[in-house]
Amino acid sequence: MDIAIIGSGMAGLAAARILKDAGHTITIFEALPGRGMDSHSIEFDGGIIDAPLRVMNPHLWKNTLSLAAHLGIKTFPVRTYMSCSWLFEDRTETWLTTSRSRIGNFPIINNRKGIQQYGWRLVKGMLQLKTAIHQFFKSKNQDITLAEFINQNDIEEVFWHGVVMPVLYTICTCNPKTIGDWPAKNLLEFLRHLTDGDMLLRMKGGTPAFVDSLIKGIDIHSGSAIKKVELQGEKVLVENEKGDQ
């Protein structure tokens, strides 16, 4: 069967690979130049910077990591350090840097300003968040948004807005209003593993290596948006602005 897939993000590429391996003929259409999933990855100093950040908790990224293993993509553990510069709207100076402990992989404040000016508030916020998450997963009312969760819990503002939310913005790549409307459960599960010190994984070669394996042997028409999706009898015509079908 000839199958068209619109979009080459994670969902589109995974579907394309699975259908290709099942014997179908696949064509991918992508509006952006190149491939959607790794279109913002940057080569720098002999390495690759993935944007958005592609670090995966093995408990939460089981399907992605299973697909990577199936394709022969190897992973390696990483310690995620932080540098926080967003706290007040009128200032963007770095106010906090962290590393990780050798035992337990827990975050450690390692700059003087972070310790002297905000240390207690950050420790307090961490304890408040861990307590709130623990209570959330013990409760029966887990069908709430992230905004509702934060409104129901007293968590130190500097910690929540200066540390936690920038991490979520980086992972989810969306604005505050959108992320506030997300179901809290999945995000809190992520934060629980993060604050517990779970080791995260990266793919060897970064996202581009993963994308290369996903699209191997598959035609992709990129750099042109879809202009027509039309039912023609028992088939569907897909055409982009360049006229590719």
Language model feature labels by segment:
Residues 2-28:
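N-terminal Rossmann-like FAD-binding beta1-loop-alpha1 element of flavoenzymes
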Residues 20-44:
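Glycine-rich FAD pyrophosphate-binding loop
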Residues 25, 74, 220:
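Residue-level detector of anion-binding/catalytic polar loops
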Residues 41-65:
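N-terminal glycine-rich dinucleotide-binding loop that anchors FAD/FMN and/or NAD(P) in oxidoreductases
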Residues 58, 62-180, 193:
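Mobile amphipathic helical/loop "lid" adjacent to a hydrophobic cofactor/ligand pocket
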Residues 187-235, 240:
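Helical element adjacent to the flavin cofactor pocket in flavoenzyme catalytic cores
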Residues 241-245:
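Core beta-strand elements of the Rossmann-like FAD/NAD(P) dinucleotide-binding domain
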